[in-house]
């Protein structure tokens, strides 16, 4: 059995169109986190960054954070369990700028929380980077 991607992206099952199957990690965010290929757009980068949070991959998160806003280091909340990602919208502003609005659900210290953010992304040298975001 293959491991489903943490981002939760699904693919319609051709045998049963009403049912969706989670994409396996190796066919979804895996190639981005393994640096085989760069994320092709801001939407894919957003999903891969969520997967990196689930997998506690600070190296990938820092590498995909724009240098102008990148922190020196990342700390993960101990015991935090990411529960799901809902991408609400992906808006291309121009060839090198985009926004992605999402809600990420998490359980921390037994308490459910959600992060609702509109993130800004920029493309430089054919690579997309997270810049910052507005939380709701």
From Swiss-Prot:
Taxonomic superkingdom: Bacteria
SUPFAM superfamilies recorded: NTF2-like
InterPro entries: NTF2-like_dom_sf, UPF0225, YchJ-like_M
Transmembrane stretches, start-end: none
Entry-linked Pfam families: YchJ_M-like (PF17775)
Family: Belongs to the UPF0225 family.
Protein's UniProt name: UPF0225 protein Pnap_0466
The organism of origin for this protein: Polaromonas naphthalenivorans (strain CJ2)
